[in-house]
A protein has these predicted regions:
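Feature responds to low-complexity, polar/acidic, surface-exposed segments characteristic
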Residues: 2-39, 46, 50-109, 116-120
Length: 120
């Protein structure tokens, strides 16, 4: 729980620090993003923490976020690895911790990282 609070505090501080930036969302469905979240989505997508769904052209704000997507966001914020270059190193942790995750799944490294860090 303490780690989760640190992660959320870091994310909030990051968003608040960069809140002066004004850039447009790169997502095709940005009109569906609630105005009160638009700035945060813009900043986090510019930082490559949010990468969109499927081919990355949509944000899908009305779609339920999955455990895999949350794990990817947490991984990118905590590690700073927005290029996901080391995420695969944690894939084996996911397979041993969760019966519904295979080491070959696109999200296995993120789930593995969060599991190993005691976040999920």
């Amino acid at each position: 729980m303490r780690n989760l609070k640190k992660i959320l505090a870091l994310a909030l501080a990051l968003v608040m620090t960069l809140s002066l930036m004004t850039v447009a969302n790169a997502f095709n469905d940005d009109k569906d993003i609630d105005a009160k979240y638009d700035e945060a989505v813009t900043v986090l997508s510019e930082l490559k923490v949010f990468k969109g769904v499927n081919d990355g052209s949509n944000f899908a704000p009305k779609q339920t976020i999955t455990r895999a997507e949350v794990a990817a966001i947490i991984y990118r914020i905590v590690t700073g690895d927005v290029n996901d270059s080391k995420a695969g190193l944690y894939a084996s942790y996911a397979e041993t911790s969760f019966s519904d995750v295979k080491s070959t799944d696109w999200y296995a490294g993120y789930i593995g990282y969060c599991s190993n860090a005691g976040l999920i």
